[in-house]
Amino acid sequence: SVALPHPHLIQGEATNLLGEPVMHVEHALRAVNHVDFDTINEVITPLHAATQNVIGIGLAMPGVVDGNGLVKRSTLLGWRNVDVRTLIERRFSLPVTVNNDATAAMFTERLFGKGGPNMMFVRLRRGVGGAVLLGDVPVFGETPAGGEIGHISLDPQGPPCACGKRGCLERLVSATSLHARLQRSDERMRASILREAGTYLGTALSMPVGLLDLADVCVYGQSDIVNDTLLSAAQAQLDLLTGSSFHPRTIIRRCECEGEITLRGEALSVLHDYLENR
């Protein structure tokens, strides 16, 4: 499986049928978020050469991915309608599974963490990724961008976003945006910046939580961003907006699983597709 966890890094991993890693590869990107077919090929080739009885290849990509492995749009990578699945299948003559990276990470939290069958997974890193499980079935939607809350505008007068709108959640609470604000700010302001971000996050979560009756929201990210300061503010705002006598309290928590959860989840997705097609 292949994932893009950081702006300057692409990772690949070969795993066994239990999702345990047997070989790991990392390459620095030539430019920030610059990924093309050759870059992905350079990661997969040594893994493929060193591994026997490969059942498939998994690609976890940031952005909107359809059921045919087409990356319809990735603002981080600057991709539109890239058929990465077909390109990799032709190169390696193996079945290829392509998922949104947040969806892949959610699979790991569901199977190896504390995630329940009705949950939302939110990742705060370069951008804001999201994925939803309902009755243990991933929600993809029509386009299919189900769970993607990063480009909901919470402040139409806010900072401009790469998608063309202003004040998107991604510009307000992503790790990249918050690190930039924290570095420019006085130490006394840092807690208030994280609390403000948590309030924005709780506001954005209130609609999907109320609409879908989700019991669990799992937030994944570095501990300098995803910590008690941010999460308690998000929880307070979510409670304020969704609390009622008939709606049990939805818990916002840090992701239980750590490490390369996207790679592991994508490997599990490859195994699922392999067994389903047998």
Give the positions of each predicted feature:
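ATP-binding/phosphotransfer module of carbohydrate and carboxylate kinases, centering on a glycine-rich
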Residues: 1-53, 112-113, 157-160, 165-278
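Phosphate-binding/catalytic loop of phosphoryl-transfer enzymes
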Residues: 53, 57-60, 64-169, 271, ...
